[in-house]
């Protein structure tokens, strides 16, 4: 009995200890999970703050969506992506890139050289001047898109127009050719000579004032390419002038054998000179302001002589000593006194295009000197075959004198594709 009582006491003590241990374990577990919950809550709160902060920052610094740019070129539509390049080959000017985005600016590069810069609308009129590889860069301020274009155009003729009045000059150019030379044949009195330039070959075709109006064939050979063209010569009316000049003056000039021989010996050979470089740019200047007393091409009868002569330029009346400007940049072929035309300057502007200045009182330039457009080359006078102070101003393509007002009003550019 005593033993049984001791066993029950031991068991009760064991159970009590077991319950106490379990309670402690439960308390410990509760403490652990409370701590874990607290820690996790802090992490969740921290994560929630970070996500909120990221959302706020993202909304304040959001960038525009990258969208493809549709560019039409070479008969295809290219969907360009920023920082990626596409490439195509254009065999016709009509196949050059086109984009219908008014807010885009465009730059075109040949290597590192900028060939074009403008709007997408202005790009419509741009044609690369020669075959090669061009980088078209489109930008809207946020993204840039690039299209590489290899131009492989067939040889083409460019000119301002196919019709010309008597006394005009037609600028011609052949582009997109690798020909080593370009030649021409025509039934006109002048056979055009072509000169090499960076983007092809160029030439000036003058129409002599005594050409019969009508249509004239013009054949141009550029390597294996042959171009059959038609030049239409239109008529113009030339006024008639009856001029009276002191017989002493005529005897010393136009009727003087020595004066004519001097001209033929010194000046005539200079007409054939053609520098293979274009010195001028844009329109030419009227070299002096003054009243026009005689127009280009006027049919002149002197002192009742039944044989007429043609006036090669325009006469501009001005006071003696009035400065005379160079009509364009060029090289002085002659600056000196001639019995026939007095103090005279002849300037070569390139490709055979020349300007002439007669009857000056004094000269301010020398032979072989380069002059700039607008530079003073002399002063108005009345030397040589002259009836009073004026400047005789003329222009020619080699031996063919042309209307100088065309050079002043329009200039000579190498025209549009035909």
Task: Kindly label every feature range from the protein language model.
Residues 54-59, 63-105, 160-183:
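Solvent-exposed, low-complexity, repeat-rich "mucin-like" stalks and linkers
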Residues 232-341:
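Surface-exposed, glycine-biased beta-strand/turn segments
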Residues 146-236:
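Cationic-aromatic interfacial patches
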Residues 323-333, 364-380:
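Short, well-structured beta-strand-loop connectors
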Residues 343-348, 369-417:
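Conserved, short, structured surface segments that act as functional micro-motifs
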Residues 125-133, 207-213:
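Surface-exposed, short loops/turns at beta-strand junctions within beta-sandwich domains
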Residues 311-312, 326-361, 389-394:
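Zn2+-dependent peptidoglycan hydrolase active-site motif and core
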Residues 1-61:
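Gram-positive cell-envelope targeting signals
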């Amino acid at each position: 009995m005593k033993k049984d009582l001791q066993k029950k006491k031991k068991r009760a003590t064991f159970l009590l200890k077991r319950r106490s241990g379990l309670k402690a374990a439960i308390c410990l577990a509760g403490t652990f999970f409370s701590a874990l919950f607290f820690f996790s809550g802090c992490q969740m709160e921290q994560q929630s703050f970070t996500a909120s902060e990221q959302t706020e920052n993202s909304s304040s610094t959001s960038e525009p969506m990258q969208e493809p740019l549709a560019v039409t070129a070479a008969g295809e539509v290219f969907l360009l992506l920023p920082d990626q390049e596409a490439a195509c080959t254009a065999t016709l000017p009509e196949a050059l890139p086109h984009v219908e985005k008014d807010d885009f600016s465009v730059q075109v590069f040949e290597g590192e050289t900028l060939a074009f810069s403008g709007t997408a609308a202005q790009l419509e009129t741009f044609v690369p001047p020669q075959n090669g590889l061009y980088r078209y860069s489109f930008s809207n301020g946020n993204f840039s898109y690039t299209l590489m274009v290899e131009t492989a155009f067939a040889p083409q003729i460019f000119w301002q127009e196919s019709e010309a009045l008597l006394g005009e000059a037609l600028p011609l150019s052949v582009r997109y050719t690798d020909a080593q030379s370009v030649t021409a044949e025509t039934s006109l009195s002048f056979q055009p000579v072509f000169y090499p330039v960076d983007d092809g070959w160029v030439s000036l075709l003058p129409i002599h004032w005594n050409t019969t109006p009508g249509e004239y064939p013009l054949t141009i050979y550029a390597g294996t390419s042959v171009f059959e063209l038609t030049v239409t010569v239109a008529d113009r009316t030339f006024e008639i002038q009856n001029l009276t000049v002191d017989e002493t003056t005529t005897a010393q000039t136009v009727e003087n054998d020595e004066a004519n021989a001097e001209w033929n010996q010194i000046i005539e050979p200079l007409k054939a000179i053609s520098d293979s470089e274009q010195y001028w740019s844009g329109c030419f200047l009227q070299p002096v302001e003054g009243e026009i007393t005689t127009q280009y091409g006027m049919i002149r009868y002197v002192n009742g002589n039944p044989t007429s002569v043609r006036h090669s330029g325009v006469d501009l009346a001005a006071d003696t000593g009035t400065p005379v400007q160079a009509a364009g940049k060029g090289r002085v072929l002659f600056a000196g006194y001639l019995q026939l035309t007095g103090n005279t300057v002849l300037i070569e502007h390139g490709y055979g295009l020349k300007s002439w200045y007669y009857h000056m009182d004094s000269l301010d330039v020398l032979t072989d000197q380069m002059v700039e457009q607008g530079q003073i080359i002399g002063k108005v006078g009345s030397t040589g075959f002259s009836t009073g102070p004026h400047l005789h101003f003329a222009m020619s393509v080699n031996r063919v004198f042309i209307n100088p007002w065309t050079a002043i009003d329009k200039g000579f550019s190498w025209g549009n594709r035909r």
